[in-house]
Amino acid sequence: MVQRLTYRRRLSYNTASNKTRLSRTPGNRIVYLYTKKVGKAPKSACGVCPGRLRGVRAVRPKVLMRLSKTKKHVSRAYGGSMCAKCVRDRIKRAFLIEEQKIVVKVLKAQAQSQKAK
């Protein structure tokens, strides 16, 4: 005959926090084991990239709190909050803006020297 199963905790509804799986004990009984919720890795701070960040553990917030810093970020500028592609683009953009400022300054200086002559 099939063995009947009962929940081991007080919550008797099939909610997200009450998910279970079957497990066979050494005494050949089948019992419920409660499964933990799956974690998600953080998304990029840029808000453009659709995927999750690589190099960061995908765990629940309570577990994340206990992890060491090396498991929560990657050793790069904006590591753990922004993906590598976005960081690369941001650095390039900042460089080009600085170059543009220098070009404007040089052109202004040339115009001043032309006026002086």
Curated annotation (Swiss-Prot):
Functional summary from the UniProt entry: Component of the large ribosomal subunit. The ribosome is a large ribonucleoprotein complex responsible for the synthesis of proteins in the cell.
Source organism superkingdom: Eukaryota
Sequence positions bearing N6-acetyllysine: 36, 43
Localization terms from the record: Cytoplasm, Cytosol; Cytoplasm; Endoplasmic reticulum
Gene source species: Homo sapiens (Human)
Sites bearing Phosphoserine, chain numbering: 12
One GO cellular component term noted in the UniProt record for this chain: cytosol
Primary location group: cytoplasm
Protein name: Large ribosomal subunit protein eL34
Xref: PROSITE patterns: RIBOSOMAL_L34E (PS01145)
Any one Gene Ontology BP term: translation
Keywords: Acetylation, Cytoplasm, Endoplasmic reticulum, Isopeptide bond, Phosphoprotein, Ribonucleoprotein, Ribosomal protein, Ubl conjugation
Linked residues for Glycyl lysine isopeptide (Lys-Gly) (interchain with G-Cter in SUMO2): 108
Recorded GO MF terms: cadherin binding; RNA binding; structural constituent of ribosome
Subunit record text: Component of the large ribosomal subunit.
Similarity comment: Belongs to the eukaryotic ribosomal protein eL34 family.
Keyword Cytoplasm belongs to the record: yes
Listed Gene3D superfamilies: 6.20.340.10, 6.20.370.70
Pfam families: Ribosomal_L34e
Chain's gene name: RPL34
